[in-house]
Amino acid sequence: VEEAARHLGSGVCAVDLAGAEALYPTEQYADLFAYAKQLRIPVTIHAGEAAGTESIRAAVAMGAARIGHGIRAAYDAETMELLKEHHITLELCPTSNLNTKVVDSIEQYPIRQLMDAGVAVTINTDNMTVSDTCIQHEYQLLADAFAFGDTQIKEFLYHAAEASFTTEDIKQRLKARITYTF
């Protein structure tokens, strides 16, 4: 965290906790994230994939601005409301979630529940090499399964711009580019 603080704004934009959340529960890192918060370093935390909604609530309590995966929030109305209230964006990774058996099929992927609840979601690859995917494939997978078109893709991209760990000026320029493209 101290190293991240030294380089914040010079190639470092946040602190991330990623990995096997079932083996290394999010709660074990509370002191680390409290320290990051004290140093004003934004935080993203891997939660709600292998572990349940309790890991998502812990990530929120620890100050996460974004949550890697968080897919299990879709099965709990209170957790979705918590994410919405705190303006926390979920970094969804459909192919990875299929590979790890979080869902049995893309048709069962609960992205619509999250969107309908007003939770901000982005589309991501997780580990491109392990999952043998790319961002274009992730978007196409969802477009095919849920009939998503430009409107939904634009929404995902807007959420990504808004949740990015950068200045408001850059966020606005990203959004303008998205608007121009769509």
Q: Where are the regions a protein language model picked out?
A:
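Histidine/acidic residue-rich metal-binding segments in metalloenzymes
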Residues: 1-14, 23-45, 49-63, 74-88, ...
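Short, electropositive alpha-helical surface patch
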Residues: 1-6, 140-147, 178-182
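Divalent metal-coordination and catalytic microenvironments
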Residues: 15, 46, 67, 90, ...
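Active-site beta-loop-alpha junctions enriched in small/polar residues
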Residues: 17-22, 48-50, 70-72, 93-97, ...
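Glycine-rich phosphate-binding active-site loops on the catalytic face of alpha/beta enzymes
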Residues: 66-76, 129, 167
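Glycine/threonine-rich flexible loop motifs
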Residues: 100-101
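Flexible, acidic glycine-rich loops studded with aromatic residues
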Residues: 105-153, 159-160
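Mid-to-C-terminal alpha-helical segments outside catalytic/metal-binding sites
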Residues: 147-182
